[in-house]
From Swiss-Prot:
Monomer. This is Shikimate kinase. Keywords: Amino-acid biosynthesis, Aromatic amino acid biosynthesis, ATP-binding, Cytoplasm, Kinase, Magnesium, Metal-binding, Nucleotide-binding, Transferase. Gene3D superfamilies: P-loop containing nucleotide triphosphate hydrolases (3.40.50.300). The keyword Cytoplasm applies. HAMAP family: Shikimate_kinase. One of its GO terms (biological process) is aromatic amino acid family biosynthetic process. Binds 1 Mg(2+) ion per subunit. The lineage of its organism: Bacteria, Bacillati, Cyanobacteriota, Cyanophyceae, Nostocales. It comes from Nostoc sp. (strain PCC 7120 / SAG 25.82 / UTEX 2576). Pfam families: SKI (PF01202). It catalyses: shikimate + ATP = 3-phosphoshikimate + ADP + H(+).
Length: 181
């Protein structure tokens, strides 16, 4: 698999709570790649939590920092990168993401909500109707997420290991398509 990928980065996109970080770690280990979570890189670089950045700079300020981090990350190879759920919202980010293979972890709202219900660290979910907010965000982002090279549909019974296996099995078909185009 590593020889097929030739060091190309994997970028995991999808909603908050989709499992990008967990699955990303597993994929990195399987491939012998490094692993980065853009939200963690942002928090380390700014010495602030994502909530603090949202509170101080707003979503637009956070998205700019996120784009700056992604611009730097895409110059490296052999990385599996878990991105923030809204990274797809800025057109400039797509030019960075296209330096690698883009994997969409597509998770239904009910599963996302079950995973995130007790999480108070998500600024976009500080809402009177967090499930409705999730549904709205997913509807807004689905046309963008669907531009990924590979869509992995996740169901409630699947473990992170099973999802990572699904990704590993699907990657060769996408790379063959890319190579033949």
């Amino acid at each position: 698999m590593s020889s097929l990928l030739q060091g190309v980065n994997l970028y995991l996109i999808g909603m908050m709570g989709a499992g990008k970080t967990t699955v990303g770690h597993l994929l990195a280990k399987e491939l012998g790649y490094g692993f980065l979570d853009t939200d963690n890189v942002i928090a380390q670089a700014t010495k602030k939590s994502i909530n603090e950045i949202f509170a101080e700079a707003g979503e637009a300020g956070f998205r700019q920092i996120e784009s700056d981090v992604l611009a730097q990350v895409c110059s490296y190879t052999k990385l599996t990168v878990a991105t923030g759920g809204g990274i797809v919202l800025r057109r400039e980010n797509w030019s960075y993401l296209h330096h690698g293979l883009i994997l969409w972890l597509d998770v239904p709202v009910d599963i996302l909500y079950a995973r995130l219900a007790a999480d108070t660290t998500r600024p976009l979910l500080q809402d009177d109707d967090p499930k409705g907010k999730l549904r709205s965000l997913l509807e807004q982002r689905t046309p963008l997420y669907s531009q990924a090279d590979l869509r992995i549909c996740v169901n409630a019974e699947e473990t992170p290991e099973q999802i990572a296996n699904k990704v590993m099995q699907a990657i060769p078909s996408v790379l063959k398509q890319t190579a033949s185009n």
